Regions:
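Structural motif corresponding to the intra-repeat A-B loop/turn of tetratricopeptide repeats
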Residues: 27, 61-64, 98-99, 115
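Canonical tetratricopeptide repeat
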Residues: 19, 53-54, 90, 107, ...
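Canonical positions in the second alpha-helix
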Residues: 6, 39-40, 76-77, 111, ...
Length: 151
């Protein structure tokens, strides 16, 4: 109730909306958390932390439209903070839940590269290359990973 008062009193303060999202997410209310994070993101569109938390809330919602929005938001965050392994993992989770397994494997390979787990990166790249019908751009990325980190 107190957070509702604060967001009503200070509607242009991204922190209060973000903190409301944090509380709602911790209370296992991902749809409401996502709404608070969306408001916070409108106020601070370049905040990687808000993008990450919005993405996590949308993943927890699990609806197809929520997953697509999570993928979009987490991709923006990844582009801004490419050396944050946790972002790559969350992006991979969103892709996997959306059924985009090849892309998920590549995102998880990127996480492995960032945290210096070369063996895992190579394993994930091999898994991509073992699939039939993989788009050439994904096959090329997997080959690059395997070449650099395959041992």
């Amino acid at each position: 109730a107190r957070m509702n008062e604060l967001t009503a009193t200070y509607p242009d303060d991204a922190f209060f909306h973000e903190f409301t999202g944090d509380i709602l997410f911790a209370m296992a209310r991902p749809a409401e958390a996502a709404a608070s994070y969306e408001t916070a993101l409108q106020l601070r569109p370049r905040s990687v932390l808000i993008q990450l938390n919005l993405g996590r809330s949308l993943i927890a919602e699990g609806r197809p439209a929520s997953l697509e929005r999570a993928i979009q938001v987490l991709a923006m965050a990844r582009n801004a903070e490419s050396q944050w392994g946790f972002l790559h993992r969350q992006y991979g989770i969103a892709l996997g839940k959306a059924g985009r397994i090849v892309e998920a494997d590549l995102a998880l390979a990127d996480e492995a590269i960032v945290i210096n787990d070369k063996q895992r990166a190579a394993q994930l790249a091999l898994r991509v290359l073992a699939r039939d019908g993989v788009a050439e751009s994904f096959r090329s990325r997997a080959s690059d990973i395997l070449f650099r980190y395959g041992g």
